[in-house]
């Protein structure tokens, strides 16, 4: 099922600015939030789509990639737009900030975002899709990948402050990140408008990261793919996701592996299957053939006389290695018999002569089948 356009999901134009995006998100998030729509799966799905769209479009780098490549920018080796790269419910930034504003005003701050001292926040988790060959899954490999992500600013070491200066406790909220205001009979708590909930202000922001404590950069990482890895395996690289803000801990990077289909082998766990076509005469008279295996060797298969289609030959320990084990699966050779095509006149004559001199013993399966079929139909005429 094709993903909806992020701009259409939020109901904004492709030229919408940050303020328009945030306003549209707030409105839709309030409408479809699970707390307001309990046991409504459609509302929950819509809520997730709205969050994913906003998390992508609010980030200038992700938005630029989406505008150029669409959803493909976050697939097949790119950063995940939903669930991980977009931050989801667990890490990211804008999503929780906005809901802190929304529900802080509604419920007196009960849903304020958890922040550590000084406004430090954990960075978002990232997703990277990697495709490898069956041969690489067999041997294992070390892959070099490049991941565009936010990293800790090397100038201010993540503090956001200009070197030689320090962040200061916010004078408006006294470091709590929240302020209270009386509205009639109610006291409403909301995010501090001065420090935006961080509890600190930065009078002299770092010139490189502009007070954010992190910058966007493409990093090169080395990923170890163990021998025997299976399709769909997820590898977690702890602390290799986006850097946290204001010196907060980094998120994690998740590598999602897919193994490409192979030209000859099909995989079932640690076992491999290979369909091998042989000639009709080889099947009838017997013979041998060599089959290449993933370990780089060749194995000889002996075909006995009268081999039938579908016959399987097992080559022990010629399959896939079992992940983190000394065990190895088997390779199963499945026989397919190729019927001759484009026969010459002489070949046809010889086959016809062979048919004439054949006995029931030469084809016991077909002879027995048609005899049983005749008996079956005879029961209807009795």
UniProtKB/Swiss-Prot annotation:
GO terms for biological process: chaperone cofactor-dependent protein refolding; DNA replication; protein refolding; response to heat. Zn(2+) 1 binds at residues 153, 156, 206, 209. Zn(2+) 2 binds at residues 170, 173, 192, 195. InterPro entries: DnaJ (IPR012724), DnaJ_C (IPR002939), DnaJ_domain (IPR001623), DnaJ_domain_CS (IPR018253), HSP40/DnaJ_pept-bd (IPR008971), HSP_DnaJ_Cys-rich_dom (IPR001305), HSP_DnaJ_Cys-rich_dom_sf (IPR036410), J_dom_sf (IPR036869). Its main location: cytoplasm. Keywords: Chaperone, Cytoplasm, DNA replication, Metal-binding, Repeat, Stress response, Zinc, Zinc-finger. The keyword Zinc-finger applies. NCBIfam families: DnaJ_bact, PRK10767.1. This is Chaperone protein DnaJ.
């Amino acid at each position: 099922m094709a993903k909806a356009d992020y701009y259409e999901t939020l109901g904004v134009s492709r030229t919408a600015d940050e303020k328009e995006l945030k306003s549209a998100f707030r409105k839709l998030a309030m409408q479809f939030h699970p707390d307001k729509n309990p046991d409504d799966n459609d509302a929950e799905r819509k809520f997730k789509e709205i969050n994913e769209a906003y998390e992508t479009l609010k980030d200038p780098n992700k938005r630029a990639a989406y505008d150029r490549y669409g959803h493909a920018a976050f697939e097949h080796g790119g950063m995940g737009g939903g669930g991980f790269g977009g931050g989801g419910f667990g890490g990211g930034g804008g999503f929780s900030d906005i809901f802190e504003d929304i529900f802080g005003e509604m419920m007196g701050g009960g849903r304020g975002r958890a922040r550590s001292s000084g406004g430090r926040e954990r960075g978002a988790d990232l997703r990277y899709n990697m495709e490898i060959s069956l041969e690489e899954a067999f041997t294992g490999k070390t892959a070099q990948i490049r991941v565009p992500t936010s990293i800790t600013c090397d100038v201010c070491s993540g503090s956001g402050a200009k070197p030689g200066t320090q962040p200061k406790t916010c004078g408006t909220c006294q470091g709590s990140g929240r302020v209270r205001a009386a509205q009639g009979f109610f006291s409403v708590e909301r995010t501090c408008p001065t420090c935006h909930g961080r509890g600190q202000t930065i009078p002299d922001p770092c010139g490189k990261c502009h007070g954010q404590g992190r910058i966007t950069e493409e990093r090169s990482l080395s990923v170890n793919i163990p021998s025997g890895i299976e399709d769909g395996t997820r590898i977690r690289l702890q602390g290799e996701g986006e850097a946290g803000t204001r010196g907060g801990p980094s998120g994690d990077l998740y590598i999602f592996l897919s193994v490409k289909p192979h030209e000859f082998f099909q995989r079932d766990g640690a076992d491999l299957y290979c369909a091998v076509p042989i000639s009709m005469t080889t099947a009838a008279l017997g013979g041998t053939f060599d089959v290449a295996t993933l370990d780089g060797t060749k194995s000889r298969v002996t075909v006995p006389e009268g081999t039938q289609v579908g016959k399987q030959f097992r080559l022990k320990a010629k399959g896939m290695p079992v992940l983190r084990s000394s065990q190895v699966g088997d390779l199963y050779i499945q026989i397919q018999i190729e019927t001759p095509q484009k026969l010459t006149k002489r070949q046809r004559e010889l086959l016809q002569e062979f048919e004439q001199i054949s006995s029931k013993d030469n084809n016991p399966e077909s002879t027995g089948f048609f005899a049983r079929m005749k008996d079956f139909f005879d029961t209807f005429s009795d």
